Amino acid sequence: MTHNDDDHKWVTTKRKEPIFFTVILFIFQIFMIICFAALTGYDTNKNYTGSENPDEFKGGEVQERVNNFYGYFRDINIMIFFGFGFLMTFLRRYGYSALGYTFIISALVSQWSVLLNGFFEAWSHSNKHGEFPSTWEFSMDSLLQGFFCSGSVMISYGAILGRVTPLHMLIMGIIEPIFFFLNVFIGEMNLEAIDVGGGMYIHLFGSVFGLTVAWFLTDRKSKECTDNAPSYSGDNFAMAGTLFLWMMWPSFNAAIAPLGEPQFRAIANTFLSLTGSTVATFIVSRLFSHLGNKLDMVHVQNSSLAGGVVQGCIAHMNINPGGAIAMGFIAGTISVCGYLFITPKVQRKLHIQDTCGILNLHCIPGFLGSIAAIFAAIKGLNNPNMYSKVEFEQIFRAGDSQASANLIATMVSIGLGIVGGLLVGVILLQLKKIKGLKSKEYYQDSAFWILPIDYPKDVATVVALNNAATSEDTAGGDDEEEGVGKEHGAVEMGKHNRIVQPKQDNKYHKQLPSDDEEEDEFKQEPI
């Protein structure tokens, strides 16, 4: 048996990828261990009570902060490692990668973010006091900032899910946090913009960053790949991720809100907004569905969360409970319409393959929330009696220029997302020379994971079931409206990544393989 040069090149480059991945990951981990040891430390003075009697020591205010902090830490921890991971398991042959990559990259980014956050805080301190600290305090806020940055990276990952190698994800996980904290440094530390739950810094920035990278990685074969489709079990697991994100989102938006009424409002407004977006999702999905007014699980998994995103900037502000529900309802409506009408046009006109639909879940709701924060700031400045004196000083840190500060921070978030995405996109294109996925490896675990015997092999069964379900609804003469006149014999990716097989005379064009054929296919495909 002979091998051509292309096969030899593919085998050679395939061996390079794990070497580069493991070496870079190992070196970067050693680098962070050294930096943590040399640059960070715990504050040992905050627990001092003035008493020399150890029996009187109970932790004081610090213990109260720890008790309050741990609940938020736990909830956000679940969101990042469980919620985002399982939300991406909808792809029928990509479950290992969705969970595994979110796991390792989130763990890495959580470490890297502590160092970057300490550096930019030290930079901000030097600008104000003229002295750059030699060591950085490792605090509870440091852990939260690590989670927030991990969330932004996971949002970006959603746009390129299925089309990247572990090395690609590692490079993006190293570079994106630099732009994330540069954005926070400009908007939070200098402009003092309002963004309690990361509507701008996490959702808007992360989604623009990911969509820009996706523009570089989108090609014709990725758009036509039939494995870019969900499975029944995958959708159920993804729905579990949605439910955990939905339940924990109030903690995400309230974690760093000022204590007292602002923190309570952040919890309440986020919850109410989530209920509004959930109701809107079921209404709009059922009303405008292209498949017989049936609910689409893609909408339920994603658009129901839009209420949490739209509250990211202003959850702690006095916006009225009815206003919170209305914002969630509007965000959910626009999100579903985005999946139905905007995403197909973006893919066709702009050539951006957005695997998870982050444009509709994070980008548009995040932008709406950022604009809402500008108007809420104007209203608050014109009606200062809406807040107590202490609340007003905590929320409107930029004073009379708060609205303009938020407008500038919104534009900066979009701009840095584009610039950072362009840089990473160019780098990932070059990395394809080391090991780029072949078209047959898109949206599959087989290239990088040891797989069990029941790993799904063919898409024909899913096509057949979809045809059987839709044929009942179109039996009354709706075939012309549903596009039966399309070219025969082609497997087409329908809207929302659903697989649609054109029909002819109520028979399937693609014959389902026999058990023996499936077994032969399994043996022939390299894992």
UniProtKB/Swiss-Prot annotation:
A molecular function GO annotation: ammonium channel activity
Extracellular side: 40-70, 121-141, 188-195, 258-263, 320-321, 379-406
Compositionally biased spans, kind Basic and acidic residues: 483-495
Recorded phenotype for the gene knockout or disruption: Does not appear to exhibit a phenotype related to osmoregulation perhaps due to functional redundancy with rhgB.
GO biological process, one term: ammonium homeostasis
Membrane topology: Multi-pass membrane protein
Region spans: Disordered: 471-527
Subunit structure: Interacts with ap1g1.
Functional summary from the UniProt entry: May be a carbon dioxide/bicarbonate transporter.
Family: Belongs to the ammonium transporter (TC 2.A.49) family. Rh subfamily.
Name of this protein: Rhesus-like glycoprotein A
The organism's taxonomic lineage, starting at the top: Eukaryota, Amoebozoa, Evosea, Eumycetozoa, Dictyostelia
Gene: rhgA
